[in-house]
Amino acid sequence: MLEFETNIDGLASIKVIGVGGGGNNAVNRMIENEVQGVEYIAVNTDAQALNLSKAEVKMQIGAKLTRGLGAGANPEVGKKAAEESKEQIEEALKGADMVFVTAGMGGGTGTGAAPVIAQIAKDLGALTVGVVTRPFTFEGRKRQLQAAGGISAMKEAVDTLIVIPNDRILEIVDKNTPMLEAFREADNVLRQGVQGISDLIATPGLINLDFADVKTIMSNKGSALMGIGIATGENRAAEAAKKAISSPLLEAAIDGAQGVLMNITGGTNLSLYEVQEAADIVASASDQDVNMIFGSVINENLKDEIVVTVIATGFIEQEKDVTKPQRPSLNQSIKTHNQSVPKREPKREEPQQQNTVSRHTSQPADDTLDIPTFLRNRNKRG
């Protein structure tokens, strides 16, 4: 029998801090989508832009330095503005168990201030996750270079950094999509990155995760990637899972990850079988020693849609810095259970959660191959 914790006081405090224009827009998208269980903070050097934020806490940083006129696309100004307002930022983030720092990289405030804010959050003891976008190529070389510097600084400051490559968003949207709509979609993907994680902890669902589970997957894990899959119809769970692990947003195959966090969100008709089916597809595509946790959330607004979000953490830097390997086709990346997968070095940490989908080197009996991995494990325990 499943047991549910009802200790309300034990809920993790999650704060989302949007930094600069892109971060503020992502926070607005989250509020519009009624993302539950998180506190929102909007931070900007531009007082006028800050007034457009829907966040309950709005914080103008670097008032003396910028006089509320913005950072002029200069990351150094953004950095100094955050340093000027350090005490104000500390006060806003105090008491948080988990802090998401979300920003668009390449401009002044997001690029310069976000790493400073992330470091403050981490110093306060919060699990700190950065969710940032890399600018579109058409935004110019200067923004690309500034973004690279900002991303590098963010990696040093956070536990896990999810980088969303805006150019890959163009592979998702239609070719005739107006430029404003493309930027809006980039903000929306930022929102999905945060919501995909926060919902698992803060929103009641079929399968919820402990904050400790998420912490294990995301503490001090460095680079991370995100894939999103959406599907409807008869085979919607399998389709959404396949789309998530072959998402253009994933710049590397998920079998290179040390940890995988998965969110399966559907309407009130989402079945437990569909959750099992989606989770098993993602588990099969992952390294056999991966530490994987998953959860499921009910969103009444989705009706027939299923959304699968996969956050893959702990990529080894050398693998990504070398000439980028081509993302494998779906058929290559989904490994069947009876294929042996070579173990990767360095050795992974042993999974610690109950929800972890553990991969065994011993092969299951043929007649159990159709049963999802974690169901087989549960049957063995039973």
From Swiss-Prot:
One of its GO terms (cellular component) is cytoplasm. GO terms for biological process: cell division; division septum assembly; FtsZ-dependent cytokinesis; protein polymerization. The keyword Cytoplasm applies. Residues 326-341, 352-365 have a biased composition (Polar residues). Residues 342-351 have a biased composition (Basic and acidic residues). During sporulation, is negatively regulated by MciZ, which binds to FtsZ and inhibits its polymerization and the formation of the Z ring. Signal peptide: none annotated. It comes from the Bacteria. InterPro entries: Cell_div_FtsZ (IPR000158), Cell_div_FtsZ_CS (IPR020805), FtsZ/CetZ (IPR045061), FtsZ_C (IPR024757), Tub_FtsZ_C (IPR008280), Tubulin/FtsZ-like_C (IPR037103), Tubulin/FtsZ_2-layer-sand-dom (IPR018316), Tubulin/FtsZ_GTPase_sf (IPR036525). Keywords: Cell cycle, Cell division, Cytoplasm, GTP-binding, Nucleotide-binding, Septation. GTP binds at G21, G22, G23, N24, N25, G108, T109, G110, E139, R143, D187. It is found in: Cytoplasm. Its main location: cytoplasm. Homodimer. Polymerizes to form a dynamic ring structure in a strictly GTP-dependent manner. Interacts directly with several other division proteins. Interacts with FtsA. Interacts with Phi29 DNA replication protein 1. Interacts with the cell division inhibitor MciZ. HAMAP family: FtsZ (MF_00909). This is Cell division protein FtsZ. It comes from Bacillus subtilis (strain 168). The gene is ftsZ.
